[in-house]
């Protein structure tokens, strides 16, 4: 998962096309992604995966609502911030064509639902909450970003897609005050008992907001399968990159915050306040227990991580998945509830040469032995368009083996991380200038490290267009990644 303003360009890489003819006879065009000449990715893979997803940004900005807060129309109030992709109807149409689920890059993270911009929640009004562990604590009187939940759900509904909720529990992009006395970023860390109570309140509050929105918008009940948010990343990136491969006794050399590279560090530098408070995996088990208590039983609960194919990190993810599934029942909200894990989500930020397909597939098969898998944030770094196209083809040929026709647990969702390069985390600072003529090809014709044959530069134009514009003259080297994915089916 990438942080604010770090959106991948993978989908644009998939949609970058050339003017030559592919082997299956489909015409390769440079048309807009809505054109009939551009095939739908979700339709192409409809017989292989339940869901094809896109990661999108709605934007963090001032909102005003016309009408009821659940069903009304949300617009930019012009007071602060800037709308992004999902806010615009043009992008909603493209998303609807190519995907049946989306993941929001930032909008549902604790940072943006709590909206304590300086890390402090001490000045916000409070109310009393009695948690299932018996702790009675003060909690914020509301989620300051509640309107952002409803605005993004409304935009997804308008786009005709479902959503993977991202994310409930994370070491990063969670306000410092959430972990500290009086919600002050300068306070002492709270006890694990208080933190458990806060954790339950937060998950309960977010999921109840979603449930209220779904009820108001005609989604037919808690256990019916008819949900806009059909899956949640309950915990994100809790394993350390330098995790050890053996765990004995009290040795915790696997969790983020316990290893030499993460211990004692701030979250921005790889540490974890969660681990500082708990010193073990208890908070992870709690998260899946709380999510099971407050989410519909048919909403999928996921553990999500990156570098999941590394030889030392794969066993750490296996370990936590098995611990979640073996977790004991506790009384939550008056009912006996066990932790529930349905999915291991492989972020899949990969390169064209590392990991190898074999290394990735070996990790995938280990995870499938435990649960279903989501490929949750797929993008591929590459040095050229041809290199990227080859990598995409190889990955999709491998992934589809584990789709609907695979016996046992399956890959049920593949999400492509990003739809344009405007704020790419892979190559955010490279600008290319093709000359004086600009032609708008929204979201289609760029790739990770895409290089023109002539070494010319491409740059964004200023003005009112919210999407980049490009001059695609006859020397512009568009790539074949989109057709590689289509043709690998």
Language model regions located:
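A structural motif corresponding to the C-terminal end of an alpha-helix
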Residues: 98, 151-163, 205-228, 286-301, ...
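Substrate-binding cleft and catalytic face of glycoside hydrolase catalytic domains
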Residues: 97-308
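Glycoside hydrolase catalytic-domain groove-lining segments
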Residues: 132, 140-159, 276-304, 310-412, ...
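Bacterial Sec-dependent N-terminal signal peptides
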Residues: 1-4, 8-43
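Short, acidic/polar
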Residues: 64-96, 201-209, 313-332, 360, ...
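Boundary/entry segment of secreted carbohydrate-active catalytic domains
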Residues: 26-101, 105-107
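Active-site beta-loop-alpha junctions enriched in small/polar residues
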Residues: 55-61, 107, 168-170, 232-237, ...
């Amino acid at each position: 998962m990438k942080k604010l303003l770090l959106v991948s360009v993978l989908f644009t890489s998939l949609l970058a096309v050339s003017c030559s003819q592919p082997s299956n006879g489909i015409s390769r065009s440079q048309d807009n992604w809505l054109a009939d000449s551009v095939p739908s990715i979700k339709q192409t893979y409809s017989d292989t995966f339940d869901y094809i997803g896109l990661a999108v940004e709605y934007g963090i900005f001032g909102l005003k609502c016309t009408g009821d807060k659940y069903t009304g129309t949300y617009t930019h109030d012009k007071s602060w911030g800037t709308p992004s992709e999902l806010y615009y109807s043009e992008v909603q149409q493209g998303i609807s064509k190519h995907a049946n689920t989306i993941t929001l890059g930032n909008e549902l993270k604790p940072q943006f639902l709590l909206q304590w911009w300086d890390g402090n929640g001490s000045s916000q009004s409070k109310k009393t909450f009695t948690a299932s562990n018996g702790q009675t604590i003060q909690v914020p009187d509301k989620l300051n970003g509640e309107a952002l939940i409803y605005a993004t759900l409304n935009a997804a509904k308008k786009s005709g897609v479902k959503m993977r909720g991202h994310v409930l529990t994370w070491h990063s992009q969670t306000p410092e005050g959430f972990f500290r006395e009086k919600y002050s970023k300068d306070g002492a860390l709270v006890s694990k008992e208080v933190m458990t109570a806060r954790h339950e309140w937060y998950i309960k509050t977010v999921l109840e907001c979603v449930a209220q929105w779904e009820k108001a918008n005609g989604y037919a009940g808690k256990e019916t399968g008819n949900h806009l948010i059909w899956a949640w990343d309950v915990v994100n990136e809790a394993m350390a990159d330098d995790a050890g491969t053996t765990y004995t006794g009290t040795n915790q050399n696997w969790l983020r915050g316990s290893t030499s590279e993460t211990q004692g560090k701030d979250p921005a530098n790889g540490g974890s306040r969660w681990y500082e408070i708990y010193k073990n995996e208890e908070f992870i088990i709690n998260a899946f227990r709380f999510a099971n208590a407050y989410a519909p039983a048919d909403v999928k609960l996921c553990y999500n991580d990156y570098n999941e194919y590394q030889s030392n990190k794969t066993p750490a993810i296996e370990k936590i998945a098995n611990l979640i599934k073996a977790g004991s029942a506790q009384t939550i909200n008056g009912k006996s509830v066990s932790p529930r894990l349905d999915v291991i989500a492989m972020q899949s930020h990969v390169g064209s040469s590392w990991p190898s397909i074999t290394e990735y597939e070996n990790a995938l098969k280990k995870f499938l032995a435990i649960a279903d898998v989501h490929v949750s944030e797929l993008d591929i770094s590459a040095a050229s368009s041809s290199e990227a196209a080859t990598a995409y083809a190889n990955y999709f040929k491998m992934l589809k083996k584990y789709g609907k026709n695979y016996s046992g647990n399956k890959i049920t969702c593949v999400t492509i991380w990003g739809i344009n390069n405007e704020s790419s985390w892979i190559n955010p600072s490279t600008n290319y200038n093709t000359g004086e003529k600009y032609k708008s090809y929204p979201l289609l014709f760029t790739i990770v490290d895409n290089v023109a044959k002539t070494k010319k530069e491409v740059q964004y134009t200023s003005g009112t267009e919210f999407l980049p514009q490009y001059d695609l003259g006859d020397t512009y080297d568009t790539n074949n990644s989109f057709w590689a994915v289509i043709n690998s089916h």
